[in-house]
Amino acid sequence: MATIQYYGTGRRKEAVARVRLMPGKGNIIINNKSLEEYFPLETLRYTVKQPLILTETIDKFDVYVKVSGGGLSGQAGAIRHGIARALVKADAELRPILKKAGFLTRDPRMKERRKYGLKKARKAPQFSKR
């Protein structure tokens, strides 16, 4: 018997998360690890759960995620974006709630490139007057 699945792709910085929602008890599995195992910081765990908490669907879906690229913070943001998109596919009535909270918007902020003549993107080498 095929179970109902909802997919959503989330992106943030260099991270890409492929999220799969299935009706269940609220388990969150990221790259075959539990949420607590994958994200050691409570703030990152909360970031991942935000769309589910806001829509009160935390105990209605099991979330399976494959995430790659970026660091932990970017990955958490990508997962949040992916979960929000999958929730909208599951129930279109949740769209205004998630949109108002800003979870459906792809955060466009990226790392600024380094320019020649500078140490980093904007940091100049030390200036010597004499």
From Swiss-Prot:
Is the keyword Acetylation in the record? no
Q: InterPro entries this protein is in? A: Ribosomal_Su5_D2-typ_SF (IPR020568), Ribosomal_uS9 (IPR000754), Ribosomal_uS9_bac/plastid (IPR023035), Ribosomal_uS9_CS (IPR020574), Ribsml_uS5_D2-typ_fold_subgr (IPR014721)
A cellular component annotation (GO) from this entry: cytosolic small ribosomal subunit
What are the GO MF terms of this UniProt record?
RNA binding; structural constituent of ribosome
Q: Which UniProt keywords apply?
A: Ribonucleoprotein, Ribosomal protein
Q: Name one matching Pfam family.
A: Ribosomal_S9
Indicate yes or no for the key word Phosphoprotein. no
Bias class Basic residues marks the residues at 111-130
Q: Where is this region: Disordered?
A: 109-130
Extract one GO BP annotation from the record: translation
Gene3D superfamilies with a match to the protein in the record:
3.30.230.10
Task: Give the UniProt family note.
Answer: Belongs to the universal ribosomal protein uS9 family.
**HAMAP family listed in its UniProt record:** Ribosomal_uS9_B (MF_00532_B)
Q: What is the name of this protein? A: Small ribosomal subunit protein uS9
